């Protein structure tokens, strides 16, 4: 089964990330405080939202978090959450990715479609790509990172070198 979302292009995700940064009073900050955003700002923006930090054994080893639309919750593995607090780039991106799912699925009301034909959706219809792109735009806004190297982006935005390179390629 393939899950397909309503199409949304990067330019709209970029605008949404910019709006979230503005609403959170972090529009010009290179280092976006994702933990503070999820803990303090998301409950103000989305009153039914809550975050649950789960024991590492709650998820299978390769799963770091989940967004459960019906429960209005993001569940994140404890080691990932603690890593995000410490500023570990991959863990910050994971938390931003789950926040991206939440915003797109709960707050924006995007629809899912299921296909049993096994085709891979175009990136702009793939909910994983959408959350990844929104997370990247939130943590590494294009207008602030333009002209920087991937190493500079990773350092000032608090993301992994891989995430920085990916974002740089979309400026």
Model-identified regions with their sequence ranges:
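Active-site hotspot residues in diverse enzymes, especially metal/ion-binding acidic/histidine motifs
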Residues: 1-171
């Amino acid at each position: 089964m393939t899950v397909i979302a309503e199409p949304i292009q990067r330019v709209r995700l970029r605008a949404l990330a910019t709006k979230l940064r503005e609403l959170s009073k972090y529009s010009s900050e290179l280092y976006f405080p994702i933990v503070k955003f999820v803990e303090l700002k998301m409950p103000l923006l989305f009153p039914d939202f809550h975050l649950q930090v789960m024991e590492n054994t709650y998820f299978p080893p390769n799963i770091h978090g989940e967004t459960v639309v019906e429960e209005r919750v993001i569940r994140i593995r404890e080691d990932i959450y603690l890593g995000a607090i410490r500023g570990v780039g991959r863990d910050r991106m994971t938390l931003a990715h789950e926040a991206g799912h939440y915003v797109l699925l709960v707050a924006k009301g995007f629809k899912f479609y299921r296909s049993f034909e096994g085709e891979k959706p175009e990136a702009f219809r793939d909910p994983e790509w959408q959350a990844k792109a929104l997370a990247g735009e939130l943590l590494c806004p294009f207008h602030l990172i333009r002209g920087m190297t991937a190493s500079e982006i990773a350092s000032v935005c608090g993301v992994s070198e891989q995430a920085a390179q990916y974002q740089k390629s979309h400026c």
